[in-house]
Amino acid sequence: MNMIIFNSAFLLIFIILLYPLISSLSPKELYPNWSSSHVKTAVKTSFFISLIPLFIYLDQGLESITTNWNWINIGPFDINMSFKFDMYSIIFTPVALYVTWSILEFALWYMHSDPNMNRFFKYLLLFLISMIILVTANNMFQLFIGWEGVGIMSFLLIGWWYSRADANTAALQAVIYNRVGDIGLILSMAWLAMNLNSWEIQQLFILSKDKDLTLPLLGLVLAAAGKSAQFGLHPWLPSAMEGPTPVSALLHSSTMVVAGIFLLIRLHPLMQDNQLILTTCLCLGALTTLFTAACALTQNDIKKIVAFSTSSQLGLMMVTIGLNQPQLAFLHICTHAFFKAMLFLCSGSIIHSLNDEQDIRKMGGLHKLLPFTSSSLTVGSLALTGMPFLSGFFSKDAIIESMNTSHLNAWALILTLIATSFTAIYSLRLIFFALMEYPRFPPLSPVNENNILVINPIKRLAYGSILAGLIITSNLPPMKTQIMTMTPLLKLSALLVTIIGLLLALELASLTNTQLKTTPTLSTHHFSNMLGYFPMVIHRLVPKTNLKWAQHISTHLIDLTWSEKIGPKSTLIQQTPLIKLSTQPQQGMIKTYLTLLFLTLTLAVLIIAI
């Protein structure tokens, strides 16, 4: 009976979420209130329904794999429509629905003047459905459908304000960088189909025991690096801030950017014994978390600071995959979703109240004018730094404890600890510039947060940012044996580096506040502010070099060869000997011509006489 309720609840969730999309296909124009009455209500209802399988799982540990029907048969190769409702999908679905419900409610206020708001909500709903398909998929083909779904919806949503050149560029960047990752996923799927003759995830785990999976796993790491913005494929993530703030909140909290990490979590049994892949994930994640945290230190755009913090946390999740602790990475995904969505909604509230101003240097004093938003932003920033008893602490502290007691790679540990300290610095810098001191914005700014569409979503996410970590860790037993003993210094290392970062940030803030002259631009500051020169090299130098070589080749091949050497010059070279031969006797020498004439006449007379 419980199994029927369990599966029926998930089926009902899909039906309810699809209903607004189906109803929008009607030829009649949608009424203005459609986005609130249909989309928000559907997501809200789905969240409460998703609690039913969650409670059944917590009570009985019930999981299920449901195969609905057979899609395609190619000889012995079957592709089924199959759903896997295990711990990961059962917990992640309510989290994603809860966060999306809050974001949609906030978007009703934030996007109220947009003429295409109904279409905007439809895109957000499709984005969510694609992510749920990805999370619940039990085969690679179905997972790929969800994977491409979040990719194309991110393109449409980042480029929502398509009349802005920056938004179009950012949307193209997102889709191109993700295409690089998609190549890795497609090649991995092709290898698995050729060598294991199956895409069913459970079958892959069984069939792969005696195979060397290094090549397909490298493809999966490339796919995760593209989707989750790891170092090398990260520039699209800060650029994605060109989209509306609700898009940024949904993109960074519970949908697209965690899809790559979730792929590795879902397929982790394939890589748990492959040291090369685990080391690759560990080093890639450590490099990402440090580099992006360093870039966040000098940014002045409030949304870009939060965006780089997302990339840094994704690097931390990748480190956890490399430590062979996928359940900790999943825990961090769930806790991170709440405070990251809240940080973006608070940023959106501030931006809207300050006439679309995003520069934190032009803010200040908002703790008096926007008290609720300021309090929530502070709570979210503290949760991000891993402050004890907030949700981020339960996952972040466990990850760093796991790193401290592992014997894998000391460099990765050091980089991660430095990045943790940097997280505290840029979080406090954001609070100091945006909320404290005196106002630095025009006095006519329409500062106002007295709207339930602003207060309620942020309040719900604040509850999640405070309680989610405690609730999840209290109800879910660990999947692996936890560390039993640890020296006090190792236990407190995460907290110590966070406190060091906070103290350093306070010292830097006081120095900045009391300085009398501008600080000279240091090379390290320039490196961080220019994002490690990465966009300049990849987006300018490489295309410029390609253009230069292409131009060089085209001018030599087409202009010099065809237009000159093969065309006019070739004709000239062929005609010149004939011209010289015919013009040689005609050199203007009259005496010679007369002599030849007389000789010719004499010979002619003699011939005639004879």
UniProtKB/Swiss-Prot annotation:
Key word ATP-binding present in the record?
Answer: no
Offer a single GO CC term for the protein.
mitochondrial inner membrane
Subcellular location(s): the record lists: Mitochondrion inner membrane
Chief subcellular location equals mitochondrion
Q: Which GO terms describe its molecular function?
A: NADH dehydrogenase (ubiquinone) activity
Q: Which residues cross the membrane?
A: 3-23, 90-110, 120-140, 141-161, 174-194, 213-233, 245-265, 276-296, 305-325, 328-348, 374-394, 408-428, 452-472, 492-512, 590-610
Its membrane topology is listed as: Multi-pass membrane protein
GO BP? ATP synthesis coupled electron transport; electron transport coupled proton transport
User: What domain of life is recorded for the organism?
Assistant: Eukaryota
Tell me the PANTHER family matching this sequence: NADH-UBIQUINONE OXIDOREDUCTASE CHAIN 5 (PTHR42829:SF2)
- What this protein is called in its record is NADH-ubiquinone oxidoreductase chain 5
Q: Which organism is it from?
A: Squalus acanthias
